[in-house]
Amino acid sequence: MFPGSTWTVIVEQIAEYEEVIDPKAFFDKIISLWKEYPNAISNRITTSVSVDTDSDLWNEVLRTFETHYKFCPRDCSEIAITKIIHKDLANNKFSDNAFEVSYYEEELLVRFYPITLDGMQHPHFESPYSIAIKIPTDTSIQLQFLKQANSSQEHFEFMKKQAFKQLYTWLKGIDLSKSSRKTNSLLDKESYIKTYRHIREDYGRGMIKGWTENSNPQKSIFEDCGIASYINELVNSDLLPKPNKFVDIGCGNGLLVHLLNKIGMSGYGIDVRHRNIWKTTLKDVDLREMPVDPQIVVQNEPHFDLDVDLLIGNHSDELTPWIPVMAAKLNCNFFLIPCCPFNFFGKYANNGSHLGPKRIVSQYESFFEWTVSVAERLGFDVKIDRLAIPSTKRLCIIGRVPEGGLCPNVDETINSMTEGQKFIARPKEIKTTNCMNIPVTDRERIAKKLFDFVLNYSDAVRDGWRCGGEVPLAQLAALLTEEDKKLMKDQDGGLQTFLRNQHQIFHVYQATARLRDFRQPVVQKRQSWKPKKAETIRKAPCWMSLHHPDGCPVGQEACRYEH
């Protein structure tokens, strides 16, 4: 303990549980989360990295610690040193050599001491602090933050209001039966961050202004910057050999191909349809509009360039499970980020048969593990990791051909898994099936039936215009005939989709529908990356003018529809 120091509790709270818990296991878990995810505590921080006990850096930090704090923690229990890596902020005043030294002073008490090697400001907490728990009952834990008595209270306001809240949330949500995957667990985190910053600033950020796609440019661009950085670090760490040529299957906007080319990896992208950005910003990138038929590869016929030795699948949908299969036939490595669940010939169904008995997992978890099992059956050396990208689907599968080769009977294994069925590629043009293609006469007939019911549901009048009532969708659904339902089902839609598409007639909100009154505009959250659209005059006739007994509520001059 720091000689002569006393500690005081600055904030504490009790967490209650429904059954008896293991306090030590819970405490160790939150300490682990606290050290590993400082970026969840402070937006100044990108990540943290554990310092190796056998390194020169470990000894340098401890020497600086001893000089600064006047005691040596080398003999303390479970001593750890964590490097805190800050975000690359403008006018940065934070240290590039910031660390936290921590140790268990008691079984349920950990001390934390900040250290910098360059004298600059620490990006995390600048004063020593402690995390502890008490055990009031068998089913509760009292979480505490402590500070040294002589430390200024001002230094700990953020800890009291924000940091403690996050730590308490972790404590309440702990499930020791579940194992959590760590982010970028296969990589040197510090090296990854340097690579990511380089790709983002040198190649990514400048593309935001010229973005022509409908997606959010910052999310799309920074996500692909993260994926490109990850693949680069896999190669640098020898987890994957540098490819002679890669192919990004289902490359979408093509940005990942562009970024990988920029950092020195040769390769191209394939997608069933081109994107607008291919002809503008990415006109010099090798992006090919063509369908991918994995069964051509399975039949040993040429489909990709002959020197391709890395297959990439980034949200490749129905081709996802085929990528390990095609890689096996080509005897090459693959990198895969599964997203929408597909099996070899359609939507994936979670029957859990490959997971073993009594395992309950989500559709995505089952699909992900099934895809891993496909790669393992083919004999790949498989590794799994979690990417640091702005996406809900960020688990990746890395498949490498082992030195001894893949399984000896690749063709038999593939035939066994695919059962001789035929793959159906996605069409180039995707048919719109959202109830808009219901024949006009049927669409107007159904709309009129629903309109009359909503209008007569209430006698309410707003400024001289009968506005009808707010009707639960379940009541409106009861009005539909079997023929009506079939028309909607054939368009992959239902009642709610139908009503939303009759925008000038109905407003749908929280499982109810009412008549649209354009005098009462609905405020919609506009996507920040899209410019505000000018009001347009529609060619469709005004429904209210034709069918409402009081006519159009806004009048011919102000109405956006034809009168």
Curated annotation (Swiss-Prot):
The keyword Protein transport does not apply. Keywords: Cytoplasm, Metal-binding, Methyltransferase, S-adenosyl-L-methionine, Transferase, tRNA processing, Zinc, Zinc-finger. Gene3D superfamilies: Vaccinia Virus protein VP39. Coiled coil: none annotated. Its EC number is 2.1.1.211. Belongs to the TRM44 family. Probable adenosyl-L-methionine (AdoMet)-dependent tRNA (uracil-O(2)-)-methyltransferase. This is Probable tRNA (uracil-O(2)-)-methyltransferase. It comes from Caenorhabditis elegans.
